[in-house]
Amino acid sequence: MLSSAIPVLRAADYPRARAFWTEVLGFSVGEEGGDPARFGIFHKDSATVFVDAWHGADEVPSPAWRAYFHVEDIDALAAALEGAQVEGPEDKVYGMRELVVVDPDGNRLCFGQDIS
C-alpha cells in the first residue's frame, strides 16, 4: 500500500535552505509554496525532500509533518485507521488527497495519494 516515504525538514531560513539543497547538494526544485516561498519540494534522481520554513521566530509554531508517505489508496488507509487520531482525507489544490495521523509522541505523519 505504501509506495515511498519523504522526509520533511524544518528550516529557519528558506532561501538559505533552498541554496543549500540546490547549489550544494544538486537537487532541483519541484514546487514551492508561499509568497515569498517558504516551502519547497526538492528532487534528485529518485530522492525527494520537503523543506518547510513556514514558522519564523515571530510566528507561533504548529505541529508540522515529520514524514510524508505516498500511498496508492488513501481512502482504504483512512478506513483502516478508523479509531486513530486522523485528520482527513482531504483533496488539496496541489493535486494530492491527504490525511494526517498523529502518533503517540505527537509526530504528524502525512499520507497522500496523487489525484492530479
Model regions: which residues?
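N-terminal beta-strand motif that seeds the catalytic metal site of vicinal oxygen chelate
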Residues: 1-18, 67, 114-116
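Amphipathic alpha-helical segments
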Residues: 15-28
